[in-house]
Regions:
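Formylglycine-dependent sulfatase
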Residues: 2-5, 13, 20-497, 503-516, ...
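Acidic, histidine-bearing metal-coordination/catalytic regions of metal-dependent phosphoesterases
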Residues: 8
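Residues forming the ATP-binding cleft of Hanks-type serine/threonine protein kinase domains
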Residues: 521
């Protein structure tokens, strides 16, 4: 055995299982295969048992759940892609690592977890979506997409050639899987590996792989019971958002109907440009497969002249059909990676983690997208398998958060958790030994306003029964004055701001400052804000104290 690895292992037996310490382990440290999708909702994984997934199963992800532990209460600290990735890389909350919003850059002076894994003797790699405003740090190997990346024939850059992107022919999920396998094929066999496989899918606008286009045509997915939510009994944020399927999903871009282009309308032109950003990359064969399904479907839609609730239901059905068709490729990828591990005798000593950067709305409250502290976007799927160390087919309902992922990686590597990380390693839960001091509540904070979807800034605290949310901040153009990054010419956020102004997207948003309180036991769908109602004084006081404790402890300076 390599002497460096031996030196790292010998002290482990002396370490306790308390927060920040490594659990005693067997002689060899495990490999880590971390698979993360973008916007994969729990509702879209059949192991979680939702009505949608019963009609569109995910057998390979389910197989992973059968081999390990499925977490039902995994939450994010900021339900937005790049901030979630920054949290994964640093183990820090958004305000601590600098990546509070999409356009802000992570503080690169912070230590990245892969750097610590490297120092501990791991070979590190990342393939697929990086989407951070910096070079990958701490990776021996990277093969990453250009920004958000495209589904069809995307651009990648490779180790030592950061920023020099080259187009590759194929589908993003398939290519990402292939590059993951290339890493595994060429890794140093005398080292444990830590590989991050980050899929673009199923991010908006849901372009399926050619073989899966239209695979759910004719399948009628059940409407969520809150689909027709009118947002009564809640504050203004739920009403002023721009993520409603009926009103805000774009027929041209999201539903892929270029025939509806209106060259006199700026929104129509922008939507068409977004669609052509994918269609224009397709090969003749890919476009033929796409046209075969979408052209007749679009013709039927235009002829039907739907409106009102009929149009809303059509949008919902086709949104879910496209989304789940994209998930089919992700599920196949998980199966291919699991099969590879088994075929190469790596399955017994590899921790496999499956998750998403955050949750997603699949029609609940009539919505798509994420951002809110409400349950569907606050939750994220988490499944962990480690044969012989984690019991098979078990479920966990303890409260875990994505700030726990970094400490978990480090614990497996035998690296002491840095003091600035406030998350907890998951090993005790995975072993069935919940510590007495395990968290009883958690803190959440969303910062990215004003931008697309117009979800207002808010933070909050959630425990096993109640949730307290505080919405705050200036509205509309008054908020722009506080976001200097949005006014830098040439940046994507500047272009976004120009577009939003041109379409009067947020010119009438009011300033807000109010609380919402939900009893998740009696109101799991969060339809009734009980803040200020008689009988809630005690729980409100308790949650307000916890919220202020978090703000003080974490040094939140937003207010």
């Amino acid at each position: 055995m390599n002497q460096n690895i031996t030196k790292a292992i010998l002290p482990l037996a002396a370490l306790s299982c308390v927060h920040g310490k490594m659990l005693a382990q067997d002689a060899a440290r495990p490999n880590i295969l971390y698979i993360m999708c973008d916007d994969h909702a729990m509702q879209a994984i059949s192991a979680y048992g939702s009505p949608i997934s019963k009609l569109a199963p995910t057998p390979n992800i389910d197989r992973l759940a059968q081999r390990g532990m499925l977490f039902r209460n995994c939450f994010v600290e900021n339900s937005l892609s790049t901030p979630s990735r920054a949290c994964l890389m640093t183990g820090l909350y958004s305000h601590q690592n600098g990546q509070r919003q999409l356009a802000e850059g992570i503080d690169t002076t912070k230590t990245f977890v892969p750097e610590l894994m490297q120092k501990a003797g791991y070979e590190t790699g990342i393939v697929g979506k990086w989407h951070m405003m910096c070079r990958p740090k701490g990776f021996d190997y990277y093969y990453i997409l250009d920004g958000q990346g495209k589904y069809y024939n995307p651009n990648f850059c490779t180790t030592g050639n950061y920023g020099k992107y080259k187009q590759e022919m194929g589908y993003a999920t398939t290519l990402t899987t292939q590059h993951a396998i290339e890493f595994l094929d060429h890794r140093q066999k005398d080292k444990p590996f830590c590989l991050y496989v980050h899929h673009k899918a199923p991010h908006r606008s849901w372009f399926a792989e050619p073989k899966h286009i239209g695979m759910y045509d004719g399948v009628d997915f059940p409407l969520p019971k809150t689909f027709w939510d009118n947002y009564e009994n809640r504050g203004s944020a739920a009403k002023t958002q721009k993520m409603n399927i009926e009103k805000d999903m774009e027929l041209i871009l999201d539903f892929k109907i270029p025939e509806l282009l209106d060259t006199s309308d700026v929104e129509s032109m922008a939507s068409y440009a977004g669609l052509m950003g994918e269609l224009g990359r397709m090969t003749a064969a890919q476009r033929m497969a796409w046209d075969k399904y979408y052209m007749p479907r679009n013709r039927r839609f235009i002829e039907a002249k739907l409106s009102g609730k009929d149009l809303a239901v059509w949008k919902y059905q086709n949104y879910i059909r496209d989304y789940m068709s994209v998930i089919a490729s992700v599920d196949e990828s998980v199966g291919q990676l699991m099969d590879y591990l088994k075929a190469h005798d790596l399955d017994k000593n590899t921790v496999v983690i499956y998750t998403s950067d955050q949750g997603f709305y699949m029609g609940e409250h009539g919505w798509f997208d994420k951002r809110f502290m409400y349950e569907e976007s606050l939750h994220t799927p988490l499944i962990i398998s480690y044969p012989g160390h984690i019991k098979e087919g078990v479920e966990n309902t303890d409260m875990v958060q994505n700030i726990d992922f970094a400490p978990t990686f480090l614990a497996y590597a035998g690296v002491q958790q840095p003091k600035e990380m406030t998350g907890k390693p998951l090993q005790p839960l995975l072993a069935g030994n919940k510590p007495k001091n395990w968290r009883k509540d958690l803190y959440y904070h969303y910062y990215d306003y004003p931008t697309y979807h117009l979800v207002r800034k808010h933070d909050g605290v959630r425990n096993d029964r109640y949730k307290l949310i505080y919405f705050y901040g200036k509205g509309g153009m008054r908020a722009v004055e506080e976001n200097k990054y949005q006014k830098i010419p040439g940046t994507s956020e500047y272009n976004c701001l120009k577009y939003l102004n041109a379409t009067h997207y947020f010119n009438d948003d009011a300033d807000v400052s109010y609380y919402e309180l939900y009893d998740l036991q009696n109101d799991p769908d969060e339809l009734n804000n009980i803040y200020g109602k008689k009988g809630t004084e005690k729980v409100t006081k308790q949650l307000m104290k916890r919220l202020n404790d978090y703000r003080k402890e974490l040094k939140i300076e937003e207010y």
